[in-house]
Design a protein with these regions (language model features):
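Substrate-binding cleft of secreted/luminal carbohydrate-active enzymes
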Residues: 20-22, 26-27, 163-193
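Acidic-histidine catalytic/liganding microenvironments
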Residues: 17, 116, 186
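Glycoside hydrolase catalytic-domain groove-lining segments
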Residues: 73, 77-88, 92-162, 181
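Surface-exposed, active-site-proximal loop segments in enzymatic domains
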Residues: 1, 68, 157-164
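Well-ordered, non-membrane alpha-helical segments in soluble/globular domains
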Residues: 2-6, 81-84, 169-178
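Non-transmembrane alpha-helical segments in soluble domains
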Residues: 5-12, 87-91, 180-184
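Polysaccharide-binding and catalytic clefts of secreted carbohydrate-active enzymes
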Residues: 16-112
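Aromatic/acidic polysaccharide-binding cleft in carbohydrate-active enzymes
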Residues: 26, 34-41, 150-153, 159-163, ...
């Protein structure tokens, strides 16, 4: 928590900047599909492993050896704790600034559920022809922003189509227009960045 707050102090200028509406904390963090094997591979003195053992004990589950199924039940509380700690740090260091999540790209559905109640806006990097967020439940009352996208073309600049390729600048413009239209058509999306 103290590291989060210390790093946020570097952005103290944002408190009074009328153009800074919010802040992302992280970018495309690696979230495994299953947390059990990840926790089991951590050294015994790692904070996350210590937290997991403590939680298993609290739940009356065996801890030696911890069962993968039991560890999986900790994924949602782990994600909730992550987003909650980030939100608390933003509120303490940058009051009045929206917390925009961590710009997820890939990751399990637990991310959207775990972010509910902590993020002001759920951010997701979508390198596709249209916006989407499979992590956030359809019925969740949370705004979503597409925090990164990419449409490359081979006719100018770097000779690579990049993450979402187009043949030329015209197709690139049409791809972006389609992408933006898909965001406008989905009431959950509040913008693209």
């Amino acid at each position: 928590q103290s590291d989060l707050e210390k790093n946020l102090r570097k952005f103290s200028w944002a408190k009074n900047d009328p153009y800074c509406r919010g802040i992302f904390m992280g970018n495309e963090l690696e979230w495994p599909d299953r947390i059990g094997p990840t926790i089991q591979s951590l050294p015994s003195d790692h904070p996350t492993r210590k937290w997991a053992i403590k939680e298993l004990k609290r739940l009356g589950k065996p801890t030696s050896p911890a069962k993968l199924a039991d560890l999986e039940t900790l994924y949602l509380p782990f994600v909730q704790s992550f987003f909650s700690k980030c939100k608390q740090a933003v509120e303490r260091e940058l009051p009045g600034t929206l917390y925009l999540g961590c710009r997820t790209h890939r990751g399990p559905n637990v991310l959207g559920r775990g972010a509910l109640g902590s993020v002001d806006v759920f951010s997701v990097n979508v390198y596709d022809s249209r916006v989407r967020s499979w992590q956030v439940p359809k019925d969740a009352d949370i705004p979503i922003i597409s925090s990164e996208f990419h449409f490359g073309a081979v006719d100018r600049g770097v000779p690579s189509p990049g993450l979402s390729g187009s043949w030329d600048q015209r197709q690139r413009a049409l791809s972006f227009a389609h992408y933006l239209s898909s965001a406008l058509a989905d009431p959950r999306f509040v913008g693209v960045h």
